[in-house]
């Protein structure tokens, strides 16, 4: 076994920097002696006390709690939006700073103001902060609600909650929302908060000049109004009116139109009107009366639409055009149950077209079944005005036309005698030819045809539905066309007319009135028309008054007086004489049951 100890290797010349063993000294034996003999002035430099354990567990719990709080705050900041009011309190300029621009949903870009209330879930994150110390020292007792409205971040939610507590119904259940302040309505529900009682009482009188119906219920310093204005108003106009009248601000007002088709809404206001604390002025609005009042009409309400009733109504009112029937029958829905059922129908266009077709058929048959005398007296009966026939006589005399000659030609014209079935009035321009003829055709409910439509196969079709036809300002080309194609039309004999959507119709054309600047009988190229027309010349220009109106005017009342005065000379027979005094039965196209009574 090798010897214990340190083995040294002798290296020449290295003894001066290689230390092989520590040198022992006996001058200082212990650490205490070293400290005692030190020349340092610092006492107790080394802490030699016993080390304590301490409360390390509490320190650990505090650190874990801080870490959890920071993690929860990070999650809240990530998933919860900061309240808008808090941002505004930090800085007004900071509220306007937005990193991401706001974008509206595409499905709402073109949404109209339909009045349908949207879901309120989108506003559910809005925080409502209220001050617990509000209005405790108010002298008038109503300052608490005003201060509350000013201090809350969502004023509308606070106002809706107060309204439901005071009036026992939700505001959104009795109103429909207008998104735009420009939308107009006749009826408005208005809720006022924090207004003087004296001003609220005086508004009952002031509003009467603006409204046809007023219902006011005052509760403390608030009031509920149901108003029907004389003319439609927007929300802006209503707010300005109430603010100026009650001396309040716009944030103290809730205003929206009521739900006009809601039965609970109508019943609510109907019940409020019967309370003693409610003030009512005017007649109950129609939308409330229809849904609350019982009438005899409810027993006869039509479950389905009946076309025959619509046809009978259009026939009685002498409505033939589709636009007239559609518009006036829609307005009739307030009075007639069948018209109301028509508005609910999805086939309104078809019903209007069918109604117009049926009325035209009935009217066409009646016209064809009447003689010319009966038709003229029928036109006279429909004219309710009274006039004088002398302007016609004076105008003919002014134009140099013998009144007796005119009556003889007109008598043959009205009878439709062949070869005497057409009257031509010719002369220079501005002589009153068209004015004279148009007034006569209008009174007799005649039809006008134009040569410009000659290229159409159906340009003579209007002559099938009239007693008198009229063609204005016939040129030489037009006379040439008549000479080549329409000689038998002027004869007064039956001819074939092409009708649209029907087979060609064979009938006798009605008597024709034609105005022209050409004297047909002076044109030898139109010699075959000389025997088919009766001509009158109007050589003198129509005189005018200082205001620009013609001196001679011809109205329906003028022609009514003319035919009544000269009916015997024209050999017109009175329909009462033909029927021997027996009244004719009115036309009816609806079926009536035995239980119907009026």
From Swiss-Prot:
Domain SF3 helicase, chain residue ranges per copy: 401-551
UniProt-listed PROSITE patterns: SF3_HELICASE_1
Binding sites annotated in the UniProt record for ATP: 427-434
Subcellular location: Host nucleus
Record's subunit section: Can form hexamers. Interacts with E2 protein; this interaction increases E1 DNA binding specificity. Interacts with host DNA polymerase subunit POLA2. Interacts with host single stranded DNA-binding protein RPA1. Interacts with host TOP1; this interaction stimulates the enzymatic activity of TOP1.
Family stated for the protein in its record: Belongs to the papillomaviridae E1 protein family.
Protein name from the UniProt record: Replication protein E1
Upper taxonomic lineage: Viruses, Monodnaviria, Shotokuvirae, Cossaviricota, Papovaviricetes
């Amino acid at each position: 076994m090798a010897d214990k100890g340190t083995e040294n290797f002798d290296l020449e010349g290295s003894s001066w920097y290689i230390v092989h063993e520590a040198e022992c000294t006996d001058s200082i034996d212990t650490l205490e002696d070293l400290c005692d003999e030190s020349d340092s002035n610092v006492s107790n430099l080394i802490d030699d006390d016993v080390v304590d354990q301490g409360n390390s567990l509490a320190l650990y719990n505090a650190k874990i709690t801080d870490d959890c709080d920071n993690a929860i705050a990070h999650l809240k900041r990530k998933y919860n939006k900061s309240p808008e009011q808090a941002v505004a309190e930090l800085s007004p300029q900071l509220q306007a700073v937005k990193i991401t621009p706001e974008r509206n949903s595409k499905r709402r870009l073109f949404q109209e103001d339909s009045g349908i209330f949207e879901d309120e879930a989108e506003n559910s994150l809005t925080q409502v902060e209220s001050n617990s110390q509000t209005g405790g020292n108010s002298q008038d007792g109503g300052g608490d609600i005003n201060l509350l409205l000013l201090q809350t971040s969502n004023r509308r939610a606070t106002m809706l909650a107060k309204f439901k507590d005071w009036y026992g119904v939700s505001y959104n259940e009795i109103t429909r929302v207008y998104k735009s302040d420009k939308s107009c309505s006749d009826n408005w529900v208005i809720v006022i908060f924090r207004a003087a009682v004296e001003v609220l009482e005086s508004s009952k009188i002031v509003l009467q000049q603006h409204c046809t119906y007023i219902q006011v219920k005052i509760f403390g310093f608030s009031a509920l109004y149901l108003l029907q204005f004389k003319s439609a108003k927007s929300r802006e106009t209503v707010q300005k009116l109430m603010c100026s009248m009650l001396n309040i601000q716009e944030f103290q007002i809730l205003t929206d139109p009521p739900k006009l088709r809601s039965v609970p809404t109508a019943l609510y206001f109907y019940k409020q009107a019967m309370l003693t604390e409610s003030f009512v002025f005017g007649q109950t609005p129609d939308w409330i009366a229809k849904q609350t009042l019982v009438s005899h009409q409810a027993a006869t309400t039509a479950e389905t639409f009946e076309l025959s009733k619509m046809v009978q109504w259009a026939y009685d009112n002498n409505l033939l055009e589709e636009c007239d029937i559609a518009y006036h029958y829609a307005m009739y829905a307030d009075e007639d149950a069948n018209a109301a059922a028509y508005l609910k129908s999805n086939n309104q266009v078809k019903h209007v077209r069918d109604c117009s077709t049926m009325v035209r058929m009935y009217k066409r048959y009646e016209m064809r079944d009447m003689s010319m005398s009966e038709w003229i007296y029928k036109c006279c009966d429909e004219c309710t005005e009274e006039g004088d026939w002398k302007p016609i006589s004076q105008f003919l005399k002014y134009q140099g036309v013998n009144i007796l000659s005119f009556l003889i030609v007109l008598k043959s014209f009205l009878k439709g005698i062949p070869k005497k079935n057409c009257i031509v009035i010719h002369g220079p321009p501005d002589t009153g030819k068209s004015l004279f003829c148009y007034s006569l055709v209008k009174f007799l409910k005649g039809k006008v045809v134009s040569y410009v439509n000659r290229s159409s196969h159906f340009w003579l079709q209007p002559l099938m539905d009239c007693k008198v036809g009229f063609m204005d300002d016939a040129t030489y080309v037009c006379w040439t066309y008549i000479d080549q194609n329409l000689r038998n039309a002027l004869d007064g004999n039956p001819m074939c007319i092409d009708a649209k959507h029907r087979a060609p119709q064979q009938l006798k054309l009605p008597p024709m009135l034609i105005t022209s600047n050409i004297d047909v009988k002076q044109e030898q190229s139109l010699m075959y028309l000389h025997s088919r027309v009766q001509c009158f010349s109007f050589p003198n220009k129509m005189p005018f008054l200082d205001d620009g109106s013609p001196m001679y005017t011809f109205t329906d009342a003028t022609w009514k007086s003319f035919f009544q005065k000269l009916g015997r000379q024209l050999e017109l027979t009175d329909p009462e004489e033909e029927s021997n005094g027996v009244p004719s039965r009115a036309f009816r196209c609806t079926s009536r049951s035995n239980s119907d009574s009026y």
